[in-house]
Amino acid sequence: MAVARHGCPPWGSILGLLVLALAAAAAWDVSFLRCSLGSFCECDFWPDLPGLECDLARHLAGQHLAKALVVKSLKAFVQDPAPSKPLVLSLHGWTGTGKSYVSSLLAQYLFRGGLRSPHVHHFSPIIHFPHPSHTEQYKNELKSWVQGNLTACGRSLFLFDEMDKLPPGLMEVLKPFLGPSWVVYGTNYRKAIFIFISNTGGEQINQVALEAWRSRRDREEISLQEVEPAVSQAVLDNPHHGFWRSGIMEEQLLDAVVPFLPLQRHHVRHCVLNELAQLGLEPREEVVQAVLDSTTYFPEEEQLFSSNGCKTVASRITFFL
């Protein structure tokens, strides 16, 4: 899904295009002045938080907790000229609920080069750490990579996907970089951002959402306090999670546990409409309904939540066009 920086104006209107042009010009002037007077935009770091907030509001369906936590955490961190530690967020939830999408938006709206920026680093266990027997080698390589890149630029973003599939103990080498005590040669590493993504805790989050629905509570009434303890405990109990028996959890180096709720049918519909718009296609109702009807839902009795969230929406649309 493409990202429009600076303004996120209404689509398809002359007024929207005018707003985009004016917003871009104003943002350029302000950003140029801001970068000229300080180190705010060092290393390709060019944050557009209003654009991020707008994009999340428009395109991230059913995730009031994730939206609020991500935006609040980033605003406080980016606006602090001397943060005491790096920003560390751990994203949890069922498959297809928006975790990877949010992480890609962070790269797009924080760095001019987006995911292609040399200061955005994405790690996948399947690609980078495929053999558990090589864990010690991976530890040395990961520590060297993180330290080397932080030495080059303290304003770096590190994304760790599929934390459920990492070799045990690997993440422990990151602990010195996540707190306030580590010194990296010549740069302020405390300006770095670390994002960890996993499905662990998804079942616990789903259960909270299901109980809220059964109690006829509004979904937006679900609070972080209802889900965070269960998610944290699920991480501690999962020997396959990268934070299992980790000092990162014990020393409370995570700034926020960000829960992603399971998606209902109307949320999947929102994803279908977004994808059709992205493809430049009219929202044909027969295509929308075909995608929704072909999606599987759970629990078996209520048929309430999408089994794959919005993950398979794009491929299903292609099939039904």
Curated annotation (Swiss-Prot):
It comes from the Eukaryota. One of its GO terms (cellular component) is nuclear envelope. InterPro entries: ClpA/B, P-loop_NTPase, TOR1A_C, Torsin, Torsin_1/2. Residues 1-27 form the signal peptide. Belongs to the ClpA/ClpB family. Torsin subfamily. Keywords: ATP-binding, Endoplasmic reticulum, Glycoprotein, Nucleotide-binding, Signal. GO terms for biological process: chaperone cofactor-dependent protein refolding; positive regulation of calcium ion transmembrane transport; positive regulation of gene expression. Gene3D superfamilies: P-loop containing nucleotide triphosphate hydrolases. GO terms for molecular function: ATP binding; ATP hydrolysis activity; identical protein binding. It comes from Rattus norvegicus (Rat). This is Torsin-2A. SUPFAM superfamilies: P-loop containing nucleoside triphosphate hydrolases (SSF52540). Homohexamer. Interacts with TOR1AIP1. Its main location: endoplasmic reticulum. Glycans are attached at N149. It is found in: Endoplasmic reticulum lumen. ATP binds at G93, W94, T95, G96, T97, G98, K99, S100.
